[in-house]
Amino acid sequence: MVNKMKWRRTHYSADIKPEMDGQEVIIMGWVHSIRALGKIIFVILRDREGTVQIVAPKQKVGDELFSQIKKLGAEDVIAVKGKVIANEKAPNGFEILPLELEVINTAKRPLPLDPAEKVPAELDTRLENRFLDLRRPKVQAIFKIRSEMLKSVRNTLYNEGFIEVNTPKLVASCTEGGTELFPISYFEREAFLGQSPQLYKQMLMATGLDRVFEIAPIFRAEEHNTRRHLNEATSIDIEMAFADDKDAMDILEKVVYNAFVDVYENRKKEIETLGIEFELPPEKFDRITYDEAIDIANAKGVEISWGEDLSREAEKAIGEEMEGLYFITDWPSEIRPFYTMPDEKNPNICKAFDLMYKDLEISSGAQRIHLYDLLVENIKKKGLNPDGFTYYLEAFKYGMPPHAGWGLGADRFTMVLTQQENIRECVLFPRDRQRLTP
Amino acid sequence: MVNKMKWRRTHYSADIKPEMDGQEVIIMGWVHSIRALGKIIFVILRDREGTVQIVAPKQKVGDELFSQIKKLGAEDVIAVKGKVIANEKAPNGFEILPLELEVINTAKRPLPLDPAEKVPAELDTRLENRFLDLRRPKVQAIFKIRSEMLKSVRNTLYNEGFIEVNTPKLVASCTEGGTELFPISYFEREAFLGQSPQLYKQMLMATGLDRVFEIAPIFRAEEHNTRRHLNEATSIDIEMAFADDKDAMDILEKVVYNAFVDVYENRKKEIETLGIEFELPPEKFDRITYDEAIDIANAKGVEISWGEDLSREAEKAIGEEMEGLYFITDWPSEIRPFYTMPDEKNPNICKAFDLMYKDLEISSGAQRIHLYDLLVENIKKKGLNPDGFTYYLEAFKYGMPPHAGWGLGADRFTMVLTQQENIRECVLFPRDRQRLTP
């Protein structure tokens, strides 16, 4: 175990090629496996980009280095200075002949979870030992794809003229209604954790910043315990002025489509590691109305009346019928939040949309109400008190342009891109009713 | 007031050039000012990218449109279809002859804060009416520069092989010590809001993800009320494995330098709007030791003994002496957090650094302790109980590589880039002891 490392890494495993035969490299990582066969030892070193085989014949490396290597155990952290030896039979066409070894840190054994194990442990055990679970290439692949997706989303939004903002997560009053909020003790006062940046991004539409986005945590004190919900999530939020629901849907299509393309082009190795069939969606997604959606559900034997929110069963029935990504539009005003703009001709329906992937809702958006009187009326209609919305409502009095926006769940979008069934697979340290650690 | 807009914007004000003489455009924004001089009306329309002059001679626009325009008031939201008329005497060399007007929304008057006013109101009034305050180009410029900075920071980190992560803000136990935490009621349990992603990003160093970054809110229940502190802030955090403090400082220099360059190159207009002298820093920043720093302070008559943290007075004295950006290194171990790696030769000092801009600390970092026994010993030495760190400590038992990292305050960095004296100028909706709204 060392306090100060002798070297710096010169190459990740994936950067070494057989053509580098004879070249000296320094590699660093974890002992993925070690096998001593008499006078030769095989060590597989694992780093972020893959694995590399180190072959140490006693005769070539000498007694001292040989016995040093022999003492290594699984998951020890090592640095190896060695020579690249092209070898057609070795994995990736080369192996490393070690010249010098530094044991950087050792691993206690047995491990509570073995990263080299083929059969994965139960999810709960894995989450308890997330730092070991994350050593498995399949698990790391999910988070590399997630990072790529976030990068792609921001690039699309920058290109579309959006400005990044940070809105507060500590808020004074119960807002929006609907979802439960977590209360905080804020000095002498009570405050709450923001369930979404909705009211703030709308207020920003009155500023002339025009197009804003934020990627940040949201907090929902909902009691349900499903494979699609967490109490802390990462939300990709946009809001755009001088725009309607159709404009917002166009941006959402670009964001989602480009993320698929960027993951496909830049994360081929991770897609392969996950062993998934990765297909690019069309550039434009199907659009069905709420009416059509409930017709599909009813036709499949799931009873649902007009005006009801889609039950889990209805979502599943519709998801079976629809392929990949699709919008559901023209929702009943009754079941959408107070700030949703009603349709001009038929105020019973509104300019809201959900973006679905099969049976999973990944985004929700709408054109919002920008007219003060209509907004106050709608707040009251939902049984809420306009007095709780003073600051928000102020922004609608002095020149608020029409605007629209959406929230896209980063965790759920990662589920779609990596084809995971449980949202906990796509969050490093998930938070649910039961789990608040690590 | 309209529910559905007739048109979409074809050009922002800044996109229109005198060479477009005769071309038809649709512009949208707020009535910045209106002046009727008998049979001619001048309207200045303001959008995100600037202002444009609309000139409406009664004789040319006709009675109906003329009287429509005459009724406009300050801060009404309008769309104008008009013709570009090159005119050397007009601002930017052109004006717009209106052909058609749509009043999209009206503004109640008087305004609680006038965006067109030359003399700004008190900060408190401005923050109360932030949506109006943000209509002022000088205020918007700060947030455009902030967005540019965040984009630049991420680009540098992507280029340096960092992966973006999201760590939880809801945490189970009082961690780190030092700063006060906000308690949350989490279903049946008590939880806390994360004061920094420190322990999580360190745990991730045991995973092999190697280089991670996160830009996210942090929450500190500190009681002080200064121009440099907020209770909710945005922190840019990185952590890198197989690295020491010097490696982390190199990355920090690149991140900060590149952000200066990107703001300088891409936000010239905003720099001009702010009226600031914007100078690029050198690529490498000066480095002084803590010992040298207290010598400077003492020489300037600020009494400070070795082992004390730098007082505000000491920071000011040192800031007067040092120019621009500089590191302070080799801090006494006593005054740095428990996870800071002590120096091999002299454990009284440690591998910590602060990045200062004049008298403002904008970043703090260190090589961390990766050795389990030393870490436990240090936790105890600081009077903390290792039992409170179970999950964190587990990650150090099974192969933790040496690692280093830093946190860079996004709000403070924005202060530096925009030359603001109060952190509240650089946060859309600041949170302090007194302010929890809007």
UniProtKB/Swiss-Prot annotation, chains A, B:
Cofactor(s) required for function per UniProt: Mg(2+)
Annotated region described as Aspartate, given as residue ranges: 198-201
Cellular component aspect of the GO annotation: aminoacyl-tRNA synthetase multienzyme complex; cytosol
Residues involved in L-aspartate binding: E176, R220, S364, R368
Binding site for ATP: R220, A221, E222, R228, H229, L230, E361, G409, A410, D411, R412
Keyword Cell inner membrane (UniProt): no
Xref: Gene3D superfamilies: Bira Bifunctional Protein, Domain 2 (3.30.930.10), Nucleic acid-binding proteins (2.40.50.140)
Binding sites annotated in the UniProt record for Mg(2+) 3: E361
Catalytic activity: tRNA(Asx) + L-aspartate + ATP = L-aspartyl-tRNA(Asx) + AMP + diphosphate
Database matches in NCBIfam families: aspS_nondisc (TIGR00458), PRK05159.1 (NF003483)
Family: Belongs to the class-II aminoacyl-tRNA synthetase family. Type 2 subfamily.
Protein name listed in UniProt: Aspartate--tRNA(Asp/Asn) ligase
Organism: Methanocaldococcus jannaschii (strain ATCC 43067 / DSM 2661 / JAL-1 / JCM 10045 / NBRC 100440)
